[in-house]
UniProtKB/Swiss-Prot annotation:
It comes from Bdellovibrio bacteriovorus (strain ATCC 15356 / DSM 50701 / NCIMB 9529 / HD100). Keywords: Kinase, Nucleotide-binding, Serine/threonine-protein kinase, Transferase. GO terms for molecular function: ADP binding; ATP binding; phosphotransferase activity, phosphate group as acceptor; protein serine/threonine kinase activity. It holds the Pfam family Kinase-PPPase. ADP binds at G153, I154, S155, R156, T157, S158, K159, T160. This is Putative pyruvate, phosphate dikinase regulatory protein. Belongs to the pyruvate, phosphate/water dikinase regulatory protein family. PDRP subfamily.
Length: 281
């Protein structure tokens, strides 16, 4: 489809940051790649007078209006003013709230800035995921002090799966591998020791997991990595490390569901740091 030379203007009116509305608009605009669109975000609009000024400007520029406003009264006023001006408009929040009102059998609470809280939680989760990926398997110890949780364990003790799972819950997680006869990084002992958790696993389970992984990648499962004698040495080394560092709680991940272990880790960390129970999932 051919484009045109016109620049289209979309006004976003929000009682908070407008970030959620902007994200939704951009997602929709992917379907209109040939159009030149200018998005103007008007934040913290919470009165009829403020809304009227935005609508007047939108009218003068022949734009479209999209809005996210919690107040039912203000939404109605915006709808009335936009309709009166003949402005194309769309309420991004109202239809959802109306459906939820019916579903829950009660009216919404008109909480201003509720979407901002959603935005903040979203960006916190993204930040946590990025941090966790960067600090997976000892890739870097820079900013280790920024971690909410640090997992320490030998290979195949679920360090990475646990880290990623927790990061999607908003926790910045670093994981540090225990390598036989290799000293732990100095940075590990310079951070808050209450945030560190040890992971251990039974020998039989570990051997089975390692052999399966080697076979999956077409490698010889009979090497030292999956041998019982080598595994015994690794576990003995890990137990020695954990015995010296008694402040680190140790979790045995053998045959445990990932979610169960993650929840227990968060519960322990929250208790140690004095965090509210609401952080536990």
């Amino acid at each position: 489809m051919d484009g045109d030379n016109k620049t289209y203007t979309i006004y976003i009116l929000s009682d908070s940051t407008g970030e959620t509305a902007a994200t939704m608009i951009r997602a929709a605009l992917v379907q209109y790649t040939t159009k030149d669109v200018n998005i103007i975000r008007c934040k913290n609009v919470r009165t009829d007078t403020q809304a009227e000024a935005v609508i007047e400007e939108c009218f003068e520029r022949r734009g479209m209006l999209a809005y996210t406003v919690a107040s039912q009264g203000l939404r109605a006023k915006i709808r009335e003013m936009a309709s009166g001006k003949g402005i194309p408009y769309f309420d991004l929040l109202g239809p959802l709230l109306s459906t939820l009102d019916t579903f829950f059998g009660q009216h919404s609470e008109d909480t201003v800035g509720a979407l901002r809280a959603v935005d903040e939680r979203y960006f916190k989760r993204i930040e946590a995921i990025e941090y966790t990926v960067k600090h997976d398997d000892g890739k870097t110890f820079a900013e280790l002090d920024k971690a909410d949780i640090v997992l320490v364990g030998i290979s195949r003790t679920s360090k990475t799966p646990l880290s990623i799972f927790l990061s999607h819950k908003g926790w910045k997680v670093a994981n540090v591998p225990l390598v036989l006869d290799t000293p732990l990084p100095e940075e590990l002992f310079k951070i808050d020791q209450r945030r560190i958790v040890g992971l251990i696993i039974d020998m039989d389970s570990l051997q089975r997991i390692r052999k399966s992984r080697l076979e999956k990648f077409g490698q010889d499962p009979g090497g030292s990595y999956a041998s019982m004698s080598h595994i015994a040495k690794e576990i003995e080394y890990a137990e020695k490390i954990f015995k010296v560092n008694r402040r680190w709680p140790v979790f045995n991940v053998t045959e445990r569901a990932l979610e169960e272990t993650a929840s227990e880790i968060v519960r322990i960390i929250a208790a140690r740091l004095g965090l509210p129970d609401s952080v536990i999932f």
